[in-house]
Design a protein with these regions (language model features):
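Alpha-helical interface subdomain recognition
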Residues: 1-84, 103-108, 115-120, 144-149, ...
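Short glycine/proline-enriched turns and hinge-like loops at secondary-structure junctions
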Residues: 68-70, 134-137, 160-164
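N-terminal glycine-rich flavin-associated loop
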Residues: 85-107
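A generic local secondary-structure boundary/capping motif
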Residues: 112-114, 130-131, 139-141, 155-159, ...
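A short, Trp-centered hydrophobic/proline-enriched beta-strand micro-motif
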Residues: 119-130
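Cytochrome P450 C-terminal beta-domain/meander region
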Residues: 134-152
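Flexible, small-/acidic-enriched active-site or ligand-binding loops
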Residues: 137-139, 157-158, 184-221
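A short core secondary-structure module
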Residues: 152-191
């Protein structure tokens, strides 16, 4: 991100860039894929991230975090986008940390937030039930049962769901309102099925069959569950847009390097005007995306009530541009861009998957129109 960073944010970016380049380059994602890693990430790398304080960037200091805000989370995720780092950071340290911070009781915060901050436990958010993202379509039921609840339903494509130690599940309650519930994935009646996504990540489909929950599993009964869920998802969208920005920047950078080096017809292909025009177009698209992502993250930190419009715009733009950048990268690499030996294809695959998660560009465009009164 090219806006003026504070000294602390600059140090975070430099640290993230150095660590991820060394410990989680694109070649590491390839190894995870080839090994068929069931969790989809390296626990050793995740532990190191916790030791550096990254996992607690949106968690208050009183619960073991560093409370640097969503801009800091976006800085980390932008660098993750550059190396395609597969980690539970978005799922656990952003989505679930936000749910607990703003929806949890004091007891829930004290019990769970320190575990997220250290990386001791991994949390995953289970919302979607269909192939496409739609947070309003929730049929999973949490039926009142004495002092507790009975949970039944299914969730699809739960990011990091297969390796999670705890789930936060969105379910519809008896009065048709939405509640967020803390659920132990090892409880009786839960079945997790590993899925392989196109980007070599490992989401899970999860079935809940009359799962018994204690009354304190519900995040803060006084909260409006729908409003809390909107905040949680928006935090994830803004930070995911930062990852998509990093992906788009890296795909563009690699492509620019390639066309400057590749010889064809006795000259560098970067000298061809047609490719120069395409590269210039990509540069302007990436720069516009950066502006939107920066605005969305800053608004989320400084004026959260005004953030939803900017977040929807940023997610829509980042989805479109990350797909454009990675697609153009393959085209300008030519035939080798289609081969598995070249890493550029991994960027294209991640762009497809990240674009669908938490809402694609069509969703974002519709959301912008809705929030603008159309």
């Amino acid at each position: 991100m090219s806006y003026i960073l504070s000294e602390e944010e600059q140090m975070l970016r430099d640290s993230a860039q150095a660590f991820l380049t060394e410990k989680s380059p694109v070649s590491e994602l390839r190894r995870l894929r080839d090994e068929g890693c069931k969790d989809g990430f390296r626990h050793a790398i995740w532990k190191e991230m916790g030791e550096m304080g990254w996992n607690g960037v949106v968690i208050p200091e009183e619960y073991g975090g560093v409370d640097m805000g969503y801009t800091a989370a976006g800085i980390i995720l932008q660098e993750m986008g550059r190396t395609l780092a597969a980690t539970p950071f978005l799922a656990s340290s952003v989505l679930c940390a936000t749910a607990l911070r703003y929806g949890g009781t004091d007891g829930q915060k004290s019990e769970h937030l320190p575990k997220i901050a250290t990386g001791e436990k991994i949390y995953a958010l289970a919302v979607d039930e269909k192939a496409r993202h739609n947070a309003k379509h929730i049929e999973t039921r949490a039926t009142k049962d004495g002092n507790g609840f009975r949970l039944s339903g299914q969730k699809r494509f739960v990011v990091c769901g297969n390796g999670a130690d705890m789930l936060i599940v969105a379910a519809r309650m008896d009065d048709e309102s939405i509640g967020l519930f803390l659920v132990d994935p090892e409880a009786d009646g839960i079945e997790r099925t590993l899925r392989r996504s196109v980007d070599s990540h490992a989401p899970a489909n999860i079935n809940f069959d009359d799962v018994k929950l204690d009354g304190d599993a519900l995040l803060s009964e006084t909260e409006d569950g729908s409003a809390l869920l909107d905040l949680v998802l928006d935090s994830g969208r803004a930070c995911l847009a930062a990852e998509q920005l990093g992906l788009a920047e890296e795909a563009f950078s690699r492509t620019l390097d390639y066309i400057k080096e590749r010889d064809q017809f006795g000259q560098k292909i970067g000298s061809f005007q047609g490719l120069q025009h395409r590269a210039a177009h990509l540069l302007t698209e990436v720069e516009m995306t950066q502006s939107l992502v920066v605005k969305a993250l800053r608004q989320l930190d400084e004026a959260p009530s005004q953030a939803p419009l900017w977040i929807a715009a940023a997610k829509a733009k980042a989805t479109k541009v990350s797909r454009l950048s990675s697609s153009e990268a393959i085209q300008m690499h030519g035939g080798v861009g289609m081969t598995d030996e070249y890493e550029i294809g991994f960027f294209y695959k991640r762009a497809q998957a990240a674009g669908e998660y938490l809402g694609d560009d069509a969703w974002g465009t519709s959301r912008v129109a809705e929030l603008s009164g159309f």
